[in-house]
Amino acid sequence: MKWVVIDTVIQPTCGISFSAIWGDMKMIIWYQSTIFLPPGSIFTPVKPGIILKDKEYPITIYNIAPFNKNLWSLLKSSQECPPGESEITNKCLHKSCIIKICPYGLK
């Protein structure tokens, strides 16, 4: 089964991400990974992780739940990344970010 990413929220201090996805139904996944799942990406879940662009990546999925608009709004409002000031300076202001390559292109 292929899943399509609608939107992703990253918490850079702990490496946890949440993605709104579409599979058989709209869902929210809570996971930890070294990769970023940008909106529009299509992946297939497999036992050790996911297959994205014909390559397998490890991913730890903590929970999958039916999409809930209120929960997604709460997650989006608590999003730490990217901070608004970074758009002006092109620099990440998070000193404790554990993500090695910024998905937003910040330095």
Swiss-Prot record:
Predominant subcellular localization, coarse grouping: cytoplasm
GO BP, sorted A to Z: cellular response to starvation
Recorded GO CC terms: cytoplasm
Signal peptide extent: none
Top-rank taxon, per record: Bacteria
Subcellular localization, as worded in the UniProt entry: Cytoplasm
Keyword line: Cytoplasm, Stress response
Keyword Zinc-finger: no
Entry annotated with the keyword Cell membrane: no
NCBIfam families xrefs: PRK09919.1 (NF007393)
Function: Inhibits RpoS proteolysis by regulating RssB activity, thereby increasing the stability of the sigma stress factor RpoS during magnesium starvation.
Entry's family note: Belongs to the IraM/RssC family.
Name by which UniProt lists this protein: Anti-adapter protein IraM
